Amino acid sequence: MASLHDLWFILVAVLFVGFFFLEGFDFGVGMATRFLGHNELERRVLINTIGPFWDANEVWLLTGAGAIFAAFPNWYATMLSGYYIPFVIVLLALMGRGVAFEFRGKVDHLKWVKVWDWVVFFGSLIPPFVLGVLFTTLFRGMPIDADMNIHAHVSDYINVYSILGGVTVTLLCFQHGLMFITLRTIGDLQNRARKMAQKIMGVVFVAVLAFAALSAYQTDMFTRRGEITIPLAVLIVICFMLAAVFIRKKKDGWTFGMTGAGLALTVGMIFISLFPRVMVSSLHSAYDLTVANASSGDYSLKVMSIAALTLLPFVIGSQIWSYYVFRKRVSHKEPMTY
């Protein structure tokens, strides 16, 4: 029978899977503004496709971080101290992007609009890349000592494997965002988004395969829990193969579902390969942080479980409702907030 700290690890995993699925297409749309939007009006249409959703989608990241803080304080302390600068970079990028969303539609000066457009682009590019780097180093292993402190060098953060992880996550988000655009726009903009998604499909596929191959060499992803992770890896490949088929048939909804499933399964596979560890020590396996030695006490976990079970359905329900209310496609002929 699963213990409370096991269940909270699963909850944290679900929150981050949800974050990358939902915020992933937000990031992708933000990146697409520089490549797909040919003028200010088209970029405005693109931003308004995610206008009603982006702030609620970010809540999944905040909730995930909050769950780690409450349920696994040692994990939170070790990770935040060891990854302090990268997390600050991510937060600054997210804050800048949020400010840009709000301000670009409220200024008439073209130069300022261009400035905010670049902030939207980099604020959408930096977080998935940095988070991809961090996740790969998380299960590749960091020099964590017996006191749960990280003593890392630059090469522990920046190496071929971590950069490939960052690039792969960024490409997955970009493609996911392009498919979201096809569901939320009409006409020429929709067609260009579909064509661009089709063009980069091969690049994304190669990146995913390269990441899987290097993961097999650099980590124990496919040996520790191979009976689960290997079928998941095959399923991820199938998702992207189906996405390639659906996009040729212009079945945008199915393609979006497949790209989202591939992204979500990739994140889920990382958490499965970690369990019961939460951070891997490259110094000695005895120094690994696990769900047992990094978690809060049983009483705290019980109280938080009751609160989570009570509130989570309302949060998920309200977000589903918002997607239903704002399901209409965005056009330059419609009033736009951003």
UniProtKB/Swiss-Prot annotation:
Its cofactor is heme b; heme d cis-diol. Its EC number is 7.1.1.7. The keyword Oxidoreductase applies. One of its GO terms (cellular component) is plasma membrane. Its main location: membrane. One of its GO terms (biological process) is aerobic electron transport chain. It is found in: Cell membrane. The chain crosses the membrane at residues 7-27, 50-70, 75-95, 119-139, 163-183, 196-216, 227-247, 256-276, 306-326. Keywords: Cell membrane, Electron transport, Heme, Iron, Membrane, Metal-binding, Oxidoreductase, Translocase, Transmembrane, Transmembrane helix, Transport. Heterodimer of subunits I and II. Belongs to the cytochrome ubiquinol oxidase subunit 2 family. NCBIfam families: cydB. This is Cytochrome bd ubiquinol oxidase subunit 2. The lineage of its organism: Bacteria, Bacillati, Bacillota, Bacilli, Bacillales. The gene is cydB.
